[in-house]
Structure formats: C-alpha cells, structure tokens
Curated annotation (Swiss-Prot):
UniProt xrefs under SMART domains: AAA
One of the GO biological process terms: bacteriochlorophyll biosynthetic process
Covalent S-S links between cysteines: none
Name listed for the protein in its UniProt record: Magnesium-chelatase 38 kDa subunit
Protein species of origin: Chlorobaculum parvum (strain DSM 263 / NCIMB 8327) (Chlorobium vibrioforme subsp. thiosulfatophilum)
SUPFAM superfamilies: P-loop containing nucleoside triphosphate hydrolases (SSF52540)
Domain of life assignment: Bacteria
Length: 346
C-alpha cells in the first residue's frame, strides 16, 4: 500500500503534472527536479493507486487489452483467428515500473534469443521493463545520471507508444504506452537541452519551508506508518473523489476545443520567449486541453494556458548565464505582454 495521494502535503506542481499526463499521455511525461527526500517517488506510486484497475488479457506480460492482443496474435503466421470471447481477462492495478540506474538497453527493451530463433524458427523474445510498463508509469530516479543513449531510447518509445527490438535481421515489436516520469537533483548534473526538450512537462520540487506544513507532513507520515489500513479508511472519500475527477476528465477530453485566437496567443508567447522548434506550442495545447477537462470546461481559454505555461516551457527556455530573472517570472511577464497585446487588438 502506497501513502495516499490526497494526503501528500504541498508539491502541487508535481501532482498536477502527473494528473495531466494521466488524462492525456500524449503530453509526453514529466521531469521532476528537486532535492532528495521531497516525496518524488512516493507521489508517483500514490497516484497509481488512486487510478481505477485496468483490464488486461490474463497473464499477459505486455498488459495488453483484448483488442491489442487479438491484433498482434492474429497477425502471427499460422495462428488461429481469435475472437474477443476466446480471450480471458483480469483486472490489475496500474503498473509502476522502476528503471534502475545501471540498467542495460537489453534489460530495458528486451532481448531476442538468436540461437533459439535460428534453430527452432521461433521468435524467442525475453520482454524488458518497457513491456511491464505498458499502460502504466515508467519511473526513473536520477534520470540526469542515466546514459544519454538510454534516455534517447526511452523518449522515442514513450513518444511512439511502441517498442521495436531488432537483432540480426529479426524484429519484434510490442505496445509500450506509458507515462514517463524522470526525477533528479539538479545539483548532481543537468540533462542535455535536447533531452530536456523531449519531456512534456517540467515540475520543480522544493523543500517546504513552512513550519506548520513540515509538522503536518511528519504527523501524517507517523499516523500512516503506525496503522496504514486505518489511515487509508480516513481518506478513502478524497481518494475516490480524485479518481472520479480524473476519469471524468478523460471522458471529457475529446469534447474540449480551442479557438484559433487562443492558439495564436500560444504561438506568440513561444516566439516571444525564443522557444526553439514547435514542441512548446504542441505541449501547451495538449496540456491546456487536459487542464480544461480536469476543470470540467469544454473550451480552452488563456486562463487555462496561464496555469500550465510554466510547466510546459520553463525547461525549453534558452539559458543566459547573465540573466537573473527566474524562468517562471520570465514566462509570466511575456504571457502578460501577449494578453495585453491581445486585449489591445480586440
């Protein structure tokens, strides 16, 4: 049992970032940077327990839905044509997979037994961590210390939703759609800008310096450790309420729209901040849609954009060693200018 998500004190940026990625995984995951001991891994596991159980084919290592299973297995040469009624299912918690710092590419992506494939003609595939993470979370602690090549591979798979393993002319592919969560301490090293840009959102975690909140954190944790079952019973209604809000937002998301005027202001903001490429606009657009759905709104406004702009853009700003303005302040300042220009134009 994980510490309940709704009882985590503070760290609103991280909590919101995770929820938005659950509503729309196309946002592209979240990078959480901050000091150690601030609840990063606790929060990820806590959110997974809030989410409703998922249906998968019974015993399937890839956590596939019936539709995914039939599509993949029916495509195998010589395999019988399957119907949904032929496939047994089971309910499981949303998977949370930890990627250890020393993991190899084979451990992450999976391996093909070439000898067995050549001698028996069977594609002998040993699934990796990406298979286990399908339809869940892949959590990487100290992502800034992970090999750059491996981070590249993970980001490519997270973006495509598929893992492809190729060895000696043999190719295996399987679904690997997950929310990628990377965390780290900026004092131990930064990610390359090219990799930073690939994460959808960037949440900052700070050590809470409010005495009352620090006392509350200790009290809640001690109460939970002494009797987890009793503690969870106390907060079950808050947990259920959050679950309903997330499920409702997922259902509402396809109905959310955005006017061209809002999209124009988003593009103007990214230009004013000197954001390279177009990932900035794409991420803000998707995140604003998810945030609007979470609020129960069907039309994205610039107020929604204002709430999530920092999460989407702070890690995409060009770094100027002489600049003293905080990234969040810079985004807020330029956003105010854009909104002012929009009001004048109107």
């Amino acid at each position: 049992m994980a510490f309940p998500f709704t009882s985590i004190v503070g760290q609103e940026e991280m909590k919101l970032s995770l929820i938005l990625n659950i509503i729309d995984p196309r946002i592209g995951g979240v990078l959480v940077m901050g000091h150690r001991g601030t609840g990063k891994s606790t929060t990820v596991r806590a959110l997974a327990e809030v989410l409703p159980l998922i249906d998968r084919v019974k015993g399937d290592i890839y956590n596939r839905t019936v539709e995914q299973y039939i599509e993949m297995e029916s495509g195998v040469k010589g395999a019988p044509v399957l119907k949904a009624s032929d496939v047994k299912t089971e309910k499981i918690p949303v998977p949370v997979v930890d990627l250890p710092l020393g993991a190899t590419e084979d451990r992450v992506c999976g391996t093909i037994d070439i000898e067995k494939a050549l001698t028996s003609g069977v594609k002998a595939f040993e699934p990796g961590l990406l298979a286990q993470a399908n339809r869940g979370f892949l959590y990487i602690d100290e992502v800034n210390l992970l090999d750059d090549h491996l981070v590249d591979v993970l980001l490519d798979v997270a973006a495509s939703g598929k893992n492809v393993v190729e060895r000696e002319g043999i190719s295996i592919r399987h679904p690997a759609r997950f929310v990628l969560v990377g965390s780290g301490n900026p004092e131990e090293g930064e990610l390359r800008p090219q990799l930073l840009d690939r994460f959808g959102l960037h949440a900052r975690i700070i050590t809470i310096n409010d005495v009352a909140k620090r006392v509350e954190i200790v009290k809640l944790r001690r109460e939970y450790d002494e009797n987890p079952e009793a503690f969870l019973k106390k907060v079950v209604r808050q947990q259920q309420k959050l679950q309903k809000e997330i499920v409702a937002a997922q259902k509402l998301l396809p109905k959310v729209s955005m006017d061209d005027s809002v999209l124009t202001d988003i593009a103007r903001l990214c230009m004013a901040l000197g954001i390279d490429g177009h990932r900035g606009e794409l991420t803000i657009t998707r995140t604003a849609h998810a945030f609007a759905a979470l609020q129960g709104d069907t039309n994205v406004t610039m107020e929604h954009v204002r709430k999530i702009a920092g999460l989407c853009l702070r890690h995409r700003l060009r770094k100027d060693p002489l600049e003293t303005v905080d990234a969040g302040e810079k985004i807020d300042r330029e956003l105010a200018k854009v909104l002012g220009e929009a009001e004048v134009a109107a």
